[in-house]
Each structure stands twice: as structure tokens, then as C-alpha cells.
Amino acid sequence: MKGKILISSPNLLSDMVFYKSIILIVDKTEDGLTGLILNRRSDLFITKDIKSTIKVKIDLYYGGPVSNNHYYLLKSESDQSESIKIGKNLYWGNNLEYLFDQIEDGLIDQQDVILFQGYSGWNIDQLDDEIENDSWIVLNDQIENAFNYKENNSWNKIIKTLGKKYRIW
């Protein structure tokens, strides 16, 4: 499942946490799966002054209901020591200071980063059960397209492409 993109089915419309969510599964361990909600931008952002005249401002997204006091990064650039590869040209990590250093040094463009507060998590068999119960739809998309789902209205656009069953949503 690592690297898969999930879209919440209309069966989850009453679940306010995952309502109209698009999630990228970023990690799978023996304990479970970790995902980040791609299309839930908040009204918050992180800023940092770098150098004497440059201020970096990165939008903050709601990654999910777990560990909301931690930040996670999704980026299209690799820095082998501080990130975990998800798939082709897509990495995740959690070192904000290193990220700002990379931006300051011109090694990463802030447009190539999504910053999340919290993450979504499932026990090892839990997500498979939820998919089997039609709570989630696994998209057959390339993960390098993950940045295309950043807008809040992405769910509406995608659900209409999934066939007659979902067109009314």
C-alpha cells in the first residue's frame, strides 16, 4: 500500500475527519500504515526568516487526526539523509529545520514541499477492511501526481471521473 493514493468514498461523508479526503500512504510497517491528507489545506502557515531579507511562508495542511503536535513534510526533492522515499520523485520526513536550511541554501524550492500537521494512521489490517467495506477507493494514479491533489476541491473533481456510481456526488 505504500505509495498508493486513496480517496474517501461517499460512504464516509458523515465522517468529518475524512470527509472528501484524498490520502497518500507514505509508510507501511509491521505496526500499520501512515498516510497524509493531501487536500485539506488549513488557514495556517509556517513562516521563518532566512537570510536578512527573505521570509519563507509555507501553507500548513491537516495530515490527519494522529500526532497533531508534530509536522510532516512531503517533497519532490531528495536529501537522502533527512527523508524517506515513497516512490519516484516523492519523499517524506519531519525535520523542519533541515527543510528551512535547504530552502535557504537554494537546494529546495518551497513550492516543491507540502507541510502537514498530524497524520492518518491505520492498524495493519484495518485499512484493508475499510477498503473492502467501500470506505476507500484506491486510485490507479502515479504517486508523482500527488501534488496535483493539493486543492480543497480535488475530491469533487476526482469522484466524478470514477464512473456512474459516483457521478451524483
Language-model region placement:
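A short aromatic-anchored loop/beta-hairpin motif
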Residues: M1-F116, S120-W169
